[in-house]
From Swiss-Prot:
Coiled-coil ranges (or none): none
Compositionally biased residues, Basic and acidic residues: 1-13
PROSITE patterns linked to this entry: RIBOSOMAL_L15 (PS00475)
Keyword Zinc: no
Keywords, ordered alphabetically: Ribonucleoprotein, Ribosomal protein, RNA-binding, rRNA-binding
Presence of the UniProt keyword Cell cycle in the record: no
Location of region: Disordered: 1-60
Organism: Lysinibacillus sphaericus (strain C3-41)
Self-association and partners: Part of the 50S ribosomal subunit.
Alphabetical list of InterPro entries matching this protein: Ribosomal_uL15, Ribosomal_uL15/eL18, Ribosomal_uL15/eL18_sf, Ribosomal_uL15_bac-type, Ribosomal_uL15_CS
Protein name per the record: Large ribosomal subunit protein uL15
GO biological processes: translation
Family: Belongs to the universal ribosomal protein uL15 family.
Length: 146
């Protein structure tokens, strides 16, 4: 077998269906849009969530809550992810970004207590959950809020 003899598997490549190219093609004239009506027109069709005039779901349900414009979103790191560092290492935001555990620092880094930590680490972050702080200190490490 040579490179120029390679062919895709039978049925793996489907040819694009060109509509509106003569009645002999089977998809000419109305091009699969049927006769007249909103969907046959240029730019026709209904918006997402439109229910044909029936009161739509998003209007039937009550309004609730608000969006806090001052909301802070923290980048999250769990305890089990911190096990990759050597025993006695100092884990900083720069180190977390460098290793790829955090791709975007956002408003800061918060350490959560999911998983187990079996290394003695000094962890510097903006926030710690109570369970994460307890687990780090139980492993012999220290936490520092920056």
């Amino acid at each position: 077998m040579k490179l120029h003899e390679l062919k895709p598997a039978e049925g793996s490549r489907k040819q694009r269906n060109r509509v509106g190219r003569g009645i002999g093609s089977g998809n000419g004239k109305t091009a699969g849009k049927g006769h007249k009506g909103q969907n046959a027109r240029s730019g026709g069709g209904v918006r997402p969530g439109f229910e044909g005039g029936q009161n739509p779901l998003f209007r039937r349900l009550p309004k609730r809550g608000f969006t806090n414009i001052n909301r802070k979103e923290y980048a999250i790191v769990n305890l089990d992810a911190l096990n990759r560092f050597e025993d006695g290492a100092e884990v900083t935001t720069a180190l977390l970004l460098e290793t790829g555990l955090v791709s975007n620092e956002k408003a800061g880094i918060k350490v959560l207590g999911n998983g187990t930590l079996n290394k003695k680490l000094t962890v510097k972050a903006h926030k710690f959950s109570a369970s994460a702080k307890e687990a780090i200190e139980n492993a012999g490490g220290t936490t520092e809020v920056i």
